[in-house]
Amino acid sequence: MPNILSLTCICFNSVLCPTSFFFAKLPEAYAIFNPIVDVMPVIPVLFFLLAFVWQAAVSFR
């Protein structure tokens, strides 16, 4: 039970203070991957749009 409570507190803390989540920096060893990490959240949206393009290609069967 304490694990669930602590997890809930962590989730609420992330919701209340999202700026620390969005503006977190990678460690210096991984700084070269910053451009890739910036684009990664957009990838699921591209798959969502691809589904519409695919359905349009097959005439929404």
Curated annotation (Swiss-Prot):
It is found in: Plastid, Chloroplast thylakoid membrane. It comes from the Eukaryota. GO terms for cellular component: chloroplast thylakoid membrane; photosystem II reaction center. InterPro entries: PSII_PsbK (IPR003687), PSII_PsbK_sf (IPR037270). Keywords: Chloroplast, Membrane, Photosynthesis, Photosystem II, Plastid, Reaction center, Thylakoid, Transmembrane, Transmembrane helix. PSII is composed of 1 copy each of membrane proteins PsbA, PsbB, PsbC, PsbD, PsbE, PsbF, PsbH, PsbI, PsbJ, PsbK, PsbL, PsbM, PsbT, PsbX, PsbY, PsbZ, Psb30/Ycf12, at least 3 peripheral proteins of the oxygen-evolving complex and a large number of cofactors. It forms dimeric complexes. One of the components of the core complex of photosystem II (PSII). PSII is a light-driven water:plastoquinone oxidoreductase that uses light energy to abstract electrons from H(2)O, generating O(2) and a proton gradient subsequently used for ATP formation. It consists of a core antenna complex that captures photons, and an electron transfer chain that converts photonic excitation into a charge separation. This is Photosystem II reaction center protein K. The gene is psbK.
